[in-house]
Amino acid sequence: MLSLLLVLGLLRLNAQTNYSVYGVGFYNQENLFDTCHDKGKNDYDFLPTGSYKWDKLKYTNKLRNMARALADMGTDVLPKVGCAMIGLSEVENARVLDALVAQPPLAARGYRYIHVEGPDRRGIDCALLYNPQLFTPQTVKLVPYVPQLPKDSAFHTRGYLTVTGTLGGEHVAVIVCHWPSRYSGSYYREVAAAQVKAVKDSLLRQHPAIKVMVMGDMNDDPTSRSMAKVLSAKAEVDEVGKDDMYNPWYNILAKQGRGTLMYQGGWNLFDQIVLSPNMLNQNGKRDFSSLKYWKCQIVRYDYLIQSTGKYKGAPKRTTAGGVWLNGYSDHLPVVVYLVKKQS
């Protein structure tokens, strides 16, 4: 069954009504590289002779670890089903994705992927994993990051992987992002936010009923100007206007102090999934006749957290301080759950 009977205590609805539930996730893969050089890319650190001594053993373990975590995403709510879609960042190429979806936990569910090779100098791209039993892709486009200043004409970074398709019988769009790094400065992430907003607005102009989700590692918090002002991702459902988006992660960071990556002992929440207004129940409504947002989750399984040492309590990353930890990622995964009443 790809549905869940949601009882009174969850949604305060008729306990005998059936609702289909869909998990949509995002997970930064933290340098999911193979062991081979890609021409024109600065991937030398992730070669057997590179600084990380990235050999077959480490690569094989990385694939196994990431597949485990990806397959577990969403299973708290949807056991044995997991997420319908998962956006990825920091994947090197299609070879890596072929190897990833061939891992038993993902292969058992038949996950496929969407990927377009991008211009990032390190060779890291975004991708979208999807379960073809739940999501049917229709269009795919990598919208480029367009530098705005003459001095940045040679600035090559990740574009915005834009995928449309059907989920739960409805037209949806997913924009998977990995915005410029913190080292670049906030200006470049605000440029990215403006460009993503333009993509989102264009989709809604062309298809007014389409439901749009922007997801990714934004390298900014929900409270940052790029997210809160430029993308206009609001903290409260009832604050969201027709040109805005809803950011369910805002209060998780601002009020609860929880996040997806740790820096100098404090949490940031760079990994976000934000939603268009037509995915919300506003002003106290409980109308699930079409796909609507239900709740969100930062995935914190024990095996994803460093249990000892200097980095205790932080995400268990692949390497730290030059030491291979056989971990997962320096980021935690995130999931939003969407609900639709079964007809």
Residues covered by each model-derived region:
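Bacterial Sec-dependent N-terminal signal peptides
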Residues: 1-19
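Structured beta-strand-rich core segments of catalytic domains in phosphoester-bond hydrolases
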Residues: 85, 91-171
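A long, amphipathic alpha-helix that forms part
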Residues: 186-208
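Extracytoplasmic/secreted cell-surface and envelope-processing proteins
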Residues: 34-35, 95-98, 122-125, 183-186, ...
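N-terminal, active-site-proximal structural segment of metallo-dependent hydrolase catalytic domains
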Residues: 15-104, 108, 114-126, 194, ...
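Metal-dependent phosphoester-hydrolase catalytic domains
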Residues: 16, 201-212, 220-343
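Beta-strand-turn-beta hairpins that frame and shape the catalytic cleft
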Residues: 16-24, 33, 134-136, 155-178, ...
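Active-site-proximal beta-strand/loop segments in catalytic clefts of secreted hydrolases
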Residues: 27-30, 89-92, 115-119, 131-132, ...
